[in-house]
Swiss-Prot record:
Membrane topology (UniProt): Single-pass membrane protein
Tissue-specificity statement: Component of the acid-insoluble and acid-soluble organic matrix of the aragonitic skeleton (at protein level).
Chain segments carrying region Disordered: 1-74
Topology Cytoplasmic: residue spans: 142
Residues passing through the membrane, by range: 124-141
Organism listed in the record: Acropora millepora (Staghorn coral)
Name of the protein this chain belongs to: Secreted acidic protein 1B
Keywords: Membrane, Transmembrane, Transmembrane helix
Location in or out of the cell: Membrane
GO CC aspect terms: membrane
Skewed-composition ranges (Acidic residues): 1-47, 54-64
Keyword Transport found: no
Length: 142
């Protein structure tokens, strides 16, 4: 009881030693004593307890370009694509010769999705325009 802790009934330290210090002299606060719950088994520095099953070791999307690309689109875009797939206008008929026609959304939606994901309006024509302007400036300087 009180004799073990070294405190009298008022909570004062009656034996003179500092009960908040470990045997080696380091200060130990009550928070540190409560926080010392052990290794949670993960590779991180967050020790949350013995039976923690938090999958902190998994890095989702790293090395997966498709996952990053999907992450660039808004949730509303993905919802719209799903709704378009549900309300497929042509009744699900497929044309093996035209893969774009097999998609449940049209060319306009594809273009919008392409532009929202950072695509260029020029789609490769930018190189031709740049080379053309470069040659014009070169001939003007000669």
């Amino acid at each position: 009881s009180d004799d073990e802790s070294g405190d009298d009934e008022n909570g004062d330290d009656k034996d003179g030693d500092d009960d908040d210090k470990e045997e080696d002299g380091e200060d130990v606060s009550e928070e540190d004593e409560k926080a010392d719950v052990g290794d949670d088994g993960d590779d991180d520095d967050n020790e949350t307890g013995g039976n923690s099953d938090t999958n902190d070791d998994v890095d989702y999307g790293d090395g997966n370009d498709e996952a990053r690309e999907i992450g660039d689109h808004s949730i509303q875009d993905i919802r719209d694509l799903i709704l378009d797939a549900i309300h497929n206008k042509d009744g699900g008929e497929m044309d093996a010769d035209n893969p774009l026609q097999n998609l449940p959304y049209g060319p306009d939606k594809l273009k919008e999705l392409y532009l929202r994901s950072g695509g260029s309006h020029f789609k490769g024509q930018l190189l031709n325009i740049t080379l053309g302007l470069g040659f014009c400036i070169l001939f003007l300087l000669l």
